[in-house]
Swiss-Prot record:
HAMAP family: NorR
Protein name: Anaerobic nitric oxide reductase transcription regulator NorR
Keywords from the named record: ATP-binding, DNA-binding, Nucleotide-binding, Phosphoprotein, Transcription, Transcription regulation
MF term (GO), any: ATP hydrolysis activity
Ranges annotated as DNA-binding: 482-501
PROSITE patterns: SIGMA54_INTERACT_1, SIGMA54_INTERACT_2, SIGMA54_INTERACT_3, SIGMA54_INTERACT_4
Domain Sigma-54 factor interaction: 187-416
Gene coding for it: norR
PTM sites of type 4-aspartylphosphate: D57
Pfam families reported for this sequence: GAF (PF01590), Sigma54_activat (PF00158)
Length: 516
């Protein structure tokens, strides 16, 4: 055998190390790369017809954020279907998923590739991939030796998956790995703040507590809400979404609680509200800080007593609904200033979740960039979307005031720009494809010079200043047409008028022309 006793011992020790799964697998992959002499190695978890990287060595860091759907990666599909060691010949016409993703070899194609499917019983749970730039890199290792490696790694991976499920569900016994489960919403990130958030999601999801999710715009609060619902006993029942910021005051109560025929002009039939739709499930109220005080009082009653009244109906209806609420405001400050009910705040914030801003998430920007690159590749029918090292550095230097949403849009825009100037079905993203400054977020123009410096104001004042400037610019761009401005800002026009009035941008109701 090509493996020495000492080398096998190193592998066994790495698999049994008393450290976290992520660190254990990273060390294992590094050891395997050294023993096998390959240029790149990766451990992948299999779920929902795709491979998810758990640990890599010798590959670009953004690979950890990519999700390799079988339908778009024929080599990985071949590994998943093989049931045994797969050796791809150097002249294979199947594209390697890591072409262009090995630092220092971006312009070269991977030559030698070995795939080891990992099984728990008869169920595929992952794969180990080994890549080399030389065509004969793995010829000295027999299939028997590689099967031994696969068996050791598969056992460790299966144990890690079972332990993770135990920790998430906090129940015994667990269901077998191959049982059908509702698809969990994946939250990408390995930074300390995100690992803590994932742990808190697992804790609160198993309960039936109402949850308040706070965070800046674009951080992924809706994704967190989906993860809480999908990890809860209500996962098989509906998750109903309502954006409170997009609710005109005139229909907000009907949207929440429903109405009966004839309750108001235009009510031509009975209609269920969001609470009825979410019965036995979960209701996600996004931007809950935008609700009026009157509606807050009615929402509080539902949380207290579990009954609702349709508009125009004297009868009460019982509902069993878990409420998840999200806000980008500091609701404690809103309570102090009289814009949010203290009793409702306390009802919602028994177990609050805070979603960190992207600038606080260390290297997660690279993982997320890889994820969005792979999404773009699939959507645009490209063979590869590669993030050049200089581009990765540029992304890490930006402070991302728009958070994950801004990063997603930046990647999509960069792919479109790069594709327009590069031939073929492979796109390489370079720094020039990202159109923003490097050192800091773009500063406001001279017209906004009077905006208060963030260091000298609290969060509320800074947010108001930003909103005031954004609305002012949108109004100018739309010739002060309020309806067009509302569309540009993706707001309901009535909500835009209320917000503008609160910010001191208007003092009277809109005239006839402003609606138009």
């Amino acid at each position: 055998m090509s493996f020495s006793v000492d080398e096998l011992a190193r592998i066994a020790i790495d698999l049994q190390s008393d450290i976290g799964h992520t660190d254990r697998f990273s060390r294992l992959i590094t050891t395997l790369r050294q023993i096998l002499g390959c240029d790149a190695s990766a451990l992948l978890r299999y779920e929902a017809h795709q491979f998810v990287p758990l640990a890599i060595d010798g590959l670009a860091q953004d690979v950890l954020g990519r999700r390799f759907a079988l339908e778009g990666h024929p080599r990985l599909e071949a590994i998943a279907r093989a049931g045994d060691v797969v050796r791809f010949p150097a002249d294979s016409d199947l594209p390697d998923p890591y072409d262009g993703l090995i630092p220092g070899h971006e312009s070269l194609k991977v030559h030698a590739c070995v795939g080891l499917p990992l099984f728990a019983g008869q169920t595929l749970i992952g794969a180990l991939t080994l890549d080399g730039m030389d065509a004969d890199r793995f010829d000295s290792f027999s299939d028997e030796e590689l099967r031994l490696i696969a068996a050791l790694v598969a056992g460790a991976l299966n144990n890690a998956l079972l332990i993770a499920r135990l920790e998430a569900q906090n129940v015994l016994p667990v269901q077998p790995v191959n049982d059908a489960q509702p698809e969990r919403q994946e939250i990408i990130g390995l930074s300390a703040p995100m690992l803590q958030l994932k742990k808190e999601i697992d804790i609160v999801a198993a309960s039936d507590l109402n949850v308040l999710i706070s965070g800046e715009t674009g951080t992924g609060k809706e994704l967190v809400a989906k993860a809480v619902h999908q990890g809860s006993p209500r996962a098989a029942n509906p998750l109903v979404y309502l954006n409170c910021a997009a609710l005109p005051e005139s229909v907000a109560e009907s949207e929440l609680f429903g109405h009966v025929k004839g309750a108001f002009t235009g009510a031509i039939s009975n209609r269920s509200g969001k609470f009825e739709m979410a019965d036995n499930g979960t209701l996600f109220l996004d931007e809950i800080g935008e609700l009026s005080l009157a509606l807050q009082a009615k929402l509080l009653r539902v949380l207290q007593y579990g009954d609702i009244q349709r508009v125009g109906d004297d009868r009460s209806l019982r509902v069993d609904v878990r409420v998840l609420a999200a806000t980008n405001r500091d609701l404690r400050q809103e309570v102090v200033e009289g814009r949010f009910r203290a009793d409702l705040y306390h009802r919602l914030s028994v177990f609050p979740l805070s979603v960190p801003a992207l600038r606080e998430r260390e290297n997660d920007v690279v993982l997320l960039a890889g994820y969005f690159c792979e999404q773009c590749r699939l959507r645009m029918g490209l063979a590869r979307v590669i993030l050049a090292e200089a581009a990765r550095n540029r992304l890490q230097q930006w402070s991302w005031p728009g958070n994950v949403r801004e990063l997603e849009h930046a990647i999509h825009r960069a792919v479109v720009l790069a594709r327009a100037t590069q031939a073929g079905d492979e796109v390489v993203l370079e720094p020039q494809h990202f159109q923003f400054a490097v050192a800091a977020p773009m500063l406001p123009t001279e017209t906004a010079a009077a905006a208060p410096a963030i260091e000298k104001v609290n969060l509320r004042e800074a947010t108001d200043s930003f909103q005031r400037e954004a609305i002012s610019r949108a109004l100018e761009a739309n010739q002060r047409n309020w309806a067009a401005t509302a569309r540009a800002l993706e707001l309901d026009v009535a909500n835009l008028h209320r917000l503008a009035k609160r910010l001191g941008l208007k003092g009277s109701p809109p005239g006839k022309n402003s609606a138009g």
